[in-house]
Amino acid sequence: MPIISVLFLVFLSSCTRDTVQDLSSREGMPDQESWGVIIILTDEGTIRAKVRSGHLEKYNEKEFVMLDSNVTVDFFDSKEQHTSVLTSEKAEINQASNDMEAMGNVVAVSDSGITLYSESLTWNSREEKLHTKENIMITTLETDTLYGVGFESDSDLK
């Protein structure tokens, strides 16, 4: 019997309770994650942009959404006519303003044939303007190529 008591005590002392961390309290963890997402940004019910990404992380307290897998954004005018498309490696959307910053190999192509290349590009949803302070390259259908630093335009690149 003493051997069983000793073995029982050894068994109990070897069992420990694993501590479970509350993941929601960890800084930097998203509140929600989704894959293969489509986000529609509207202004008073009118579609202004349709955002697609392979992966989304939503941070409620910080009020932003991180898109980090092949982002594609289709822009629309006030009559919901397609005007341009933007692609990037990743993007952040400010949920309070619906502003978006695209980052990494950003390419914006207007339906009129103008193409903009940059490392980052911000879309101000209220003003419906694209802008950057980065180096840019613009190509046109007439085979013109322009280089510069900084850029601002309507989302249709006119």
PLM regions and their residue ranges:
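N-terminal amphipathic/hydrophobic interface segments
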Residues: C15-K158
